[in-house]
Every structure is written in C-alpha cells, then in structure tokens.
Amino acid sequence: MLTHLDSQGRANMVDVTEKAVTSREATAEAVVRMRPETLQLIQDGGHPKGDVFAVARIAGIQAAKRTHELIPLCHPLLLTSVKLELQAEAPDAVRIRARCRLAGQTGVEMEALTAASVAALTIYDMCKAVDRGMVIEQVQLLEKLGGKSGHYRKEEEGQA
C-alpha cells in the first residue's frame, strides 16, 4: 500500500501526529563520473570557480534542509545533523555520501537522497565548462535506521 494515497487514490501528506518520536538516520550516495583531467583539476584545487568539494558540501546540506520545498508530500523536518563526505575515486569519479539524522516522527531518507543529489548537481554545475560529458549515477539509499519499518541496509537486499 502506498502511504501517500487516500482511499480514493488521491495524493495526501501522511499524518504522523500519533507516531512516536524516535531516533532516525539515513545514508545515501551519488557518484559523478568525469574525465580524469577534470578530477585532477578538482584535486589540485585549480578549478577557476574555487573549492568544488566545499561548495558541493554546503549545497548538499542546504538541500537536505529544504527537501520539503522540493518534494511535494515531504514533511518539514528539524534535522539535527547533516554530513556530506566527498571522495575522489581515481581515475574518473567523485563519490558523495550524505547522512541525515533527527529525533522525529518520520524518516530522513528523502533528505539524504536530496543532499547527495544536489551535491552531485553542484559538482556538475561547477565543472560543466571544462567537462560537459559528466554523468551522475548510482543515486541510492544505502542505509536507514529507526522508525516502524526498522533497519534497512542495501547489502542485505542483495543489491550491492
């Protein structure tokens, strides 16, 4: 059953009023593939627009905080932590991991996915002048903790 649909099939925001406040956490990732020269430019700090990783990290944090403004039926959440790790993977990729946490009545999967996605889009935006062939891939939820549905880890599903 899709929780965002009412009995007539109309989209509605899920009512979480009666749900218990619990600790919740989600980790998502995205990968940006690029030419090796582009990755080297980022790593050397020689990009004309500045520190690509720093800007992407801030963009991801901001995106997580504003997810409810982008995805229509998401609840506005009081996130207690948003962390992004960006790692160069030679010869041609950047892996972005976003982790969101809160004590609340609904999960933070969409916030983590949004953070990773927007960080990847920011890398694309900053580097498109030197590499229009970049590809954003593998946007996925890696792990989710807390709430009624419990613990999910991607590897447990056999999708690693």
Curated annotation (Swiss-Prot):
Give GO terms for biological process. Mo-molybdopterin cofactor biosynthetic process
Q: What Gene Ontology molecular-function terms does this entry list?
A: cyclic pyranopterin monophosphate synthase activity
Q: Which Pfam families match?
A: MoaC (PF01967)
Q: Does the keyword Magnesium apply?
A: no
Task: Kindly give the Gene3D superfamilies that the UniProt entry links to this protein.
Answer: Molybdopterin cofactor biosynthesis C (MoaC) domain
EC number, as in UniProt: 4.6.1.17
Q: Where is the active site?
A: 125
Identify the residues that bind substrate. Answer: 73-75, 110-111
Q: Which UniProt keywords apply?
A: Lyase, Molybdenum cofactor biosynthesis
The pathway noted for it is: Cofactor biosynthesis; molybdopterin biosynthesis
Q: What class of enzyme is it?
A: lyase
Q: What's the catalysed reaction?
A: (8S)-3',8-cyclo-7,8-dihydroguanosine 5'-triphosphate = cyclic pyranopterin phosphate + diphosphate
Family from the record: Belongs to the MoaC family.
- What's the subunit arrangement here? Homohexamer; trimer of dimers.
| Functional summary from the UniProt entry | Catalyzes the conversion of (8S)-3',8-cyclo-7,8-dihydroguanosine 5'-triphosphate to cyclic pyranopterin monophosphate (cPMP).
**What is the protein name stated in its UniProt record?**
Cyclic pyranopterin monophosphate synthase
Q: Which organism is it from?
A: Pseudomonas aeruginosa (strain ATCC 15692 / DSM 22644 / CIP 104116 / JCM 14847 / LMG 12228 / 1C / PRS 101 / PAO1)
Taxonomically, what lineage is the organism?
Bacteria, Pseudomonadati, Pseudomonadota, Gammaproteobacteria, Pseudomonadales
